[in-house]
């Protein structure tokens, strides 16, 4: 069974995450698509694949998606980018990571990365 957790983005705003920490030197970060969540085939497959190959895995649901805070219609690209940056900084810190994105996530990945530095 997959265990999802929450991380506080702000005082009362929780983001749902899936973080499989296996003490690897690399973390695969999966960013889902628009109006999607982490319970689909792609994130669950990647999580299983990473566990099997002893690689850390991280995914999150942006604001207004899945069980994270907020309503979808109030979300913005900037807000979702900030969600991604926050989770990467908080969980991965300075470790190496590889971003894999689907649909919107494929766009948020590079946009978030350029704002991490």
What are the roles of these predicted feature ranges?
Residues 1-21:
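N-terminal cap/lid segment of alpha/beta-hydrolase-fold proteins
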Residues 25-33:
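Short beta-strand element of the alpha/beta-hydrolase
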Residues 35-45:
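The serine-hydrolase catalytic nucleophile loop
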Residues 50-67:
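Conserved alpha/beta-hydrolase
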Residues 66-91:
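Catalytic nucleophile-loop/oxyanion-hole region of alpha/beta-hydrolase
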Residues 94-102:
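Alpha/beta-hydrolase fold nucleophile elbow
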Residues 101, 105, 109:
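Gly/Ala-rich beta-loop-alpha elbow adjacent to hydrolase catalytic centers
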Residues 114-117:
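Conserved small/polar residues in nucleotide/adenosyl-binding loops
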């Amino acid at each position: 069974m997959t265990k999802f957790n929450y991380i506080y983005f702000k005082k009362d705003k929780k983001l749902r995450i899936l973080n499989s920490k296996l003490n690897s030197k690399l973390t695969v970060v999966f960013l889902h698509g628009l109006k999607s969540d982490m319970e689909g085939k792609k994130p669950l497959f990647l999580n299983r694949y990473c566990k099997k190959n002893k690689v850390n895995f991280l995914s999150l649901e942006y604001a207004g998606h899945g069980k994270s805070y907020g309503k979808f219609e109030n979300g913005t690209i900037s807000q979702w980018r900030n969600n991604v940056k926050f989770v990467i900084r908080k969980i991965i810190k300075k470790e190496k990571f590889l971003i894999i994105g689907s649909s919107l996530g494929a766009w948020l990945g590079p946009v978030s990365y350029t704002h991490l530095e």
